[in-house]
Amino acid sequence: MAATKPHINLAVIGHIDHGKSTLVGRLLFETGAVPAHIIEQYKKEAESKGKGTFEFAWVMDSLKEERERGITIDIAHRRFDTEKYYFTVVDCPGHRDFVKNMITGASQADAAILVCAAPDGVMQQTKEHIFLSKTLGINQLIIAVNKMDAINYDQKRYNEVKEEVSKILRMIGFKPDQIPFIPTSAFKGTNIAKHAEETPWYTGVTILEALNALKEPEKPTQLPLRVPIQDVYTISGIGLVPVGRVETGIMKKGDKVIFRPGIDGVGHAGEVKSIEMHHEEIPQALPGDNIGFNVRGIEKNLIRRGDVCGHVDKQPTVAVEFKAQVVVLQHPSAITAGYTPVFHCHTAQVACTLTQILATLDPKTGGVKEQNPPFIKTGDAAIVLIRPTRPLVIEKVKEIPQLGRFAIRDMGQTVAAGVVMDITPK
């Protein structure tokens, strides 16, 4: 098992049609994860459908319907190796209605490549995805200023886009001077694996060099076990196989685990019989591992996506109510107490009611600006009380940060994002 190299989950984010899937396809090709003959086959198929430049993107968009529509829907996991790490790519969809996939996808990422097309520059989703990455705790970014071939590798335009992106990064607390900006053409392979003659003015790293230079994520093995469930399968002859990513802690064969809240809100316990990753059985699973595990002692209809698996002696927290700090990213009017949008936290999606707005904060100092304001609006940071309409596992961001973040969606868009400060447990 290639577990000898450290593992990094990589999100690829950015506006639609800026070249995310093509970049991922190119990375897989350049690192030998996808054989050349498969790319050839895709190329022929793409040309026959009149989409000649799409062959690299097709590696990721292997769902038939997506190929026809030319967009990425579900989050595709693919793996590739560099000298130093092995990566699982979480290819995050860029279409507006898929931002919630982006939320569950990015919350699994240790680092992200933000793809911004040079001809267009910063678009709505470019901003949204940078905001979300920050809220969801992605601290390592690489910026690919892509489609440089479409602007004849013009340095002036590259610098303009770099400045546009830097402005947004600064606004939310990233330091642009510590982030690599790379002029790329994913389609042509410019500055992906090797330095390109087309950009003699650029002396920085390639995408692969930037990936190798990422810091290894610290594995939160000492925290309690938490595995948010993505899917639950029943496999004949084996039984119940939940699938998810270990966020914190360690899971071993023989562990007694509990899934909360469960369909009926009471939680269900069982025993781990085996654990698989990349179709190979492993003795234990660590944070960052995407696993399927066989559990005995639980009926199949009792657990579902959005439940969280933990050890019986340190169970996941089900919240009756929680206090959170939120940032309103975009809302057409004002948000008042009683507002009930959908909260996306790890793999769960639950409608929650904002019961009280306790205070607004001054974004510069973090201090209280106003106590008990009547409403909050776009751009505001606030402390609020929230009550889920059905049982939801969520943790304090100070205790288990991976499960202490959430995004709020309404009207097909991400309205706000936030972190959990305190919980009234069930």
Curated annotation (Swiss-Prot):
It is found in: Cytoplasm. GTP binds at residues 14-21, 91-95, 146-149. Its EC number is 3.6.5.3. Its main location: cytoplasm. InterPro entries: EFTu-like_2, G_TR_CS, GTP-eEF1A_C, P-loop_NTPase, Small_GTP-bd, T_Tr_GTP-bd_dom, TRAFAC_GTPase_members, Transl_B-barrel_sf. Residues 5-221 form the tr-type G domain. Residues 14-21 are annotated as: G1. PANTHER family: TRANSLATION FACTOR. This is Elongation factor 1-alpha. The gene is tuf.
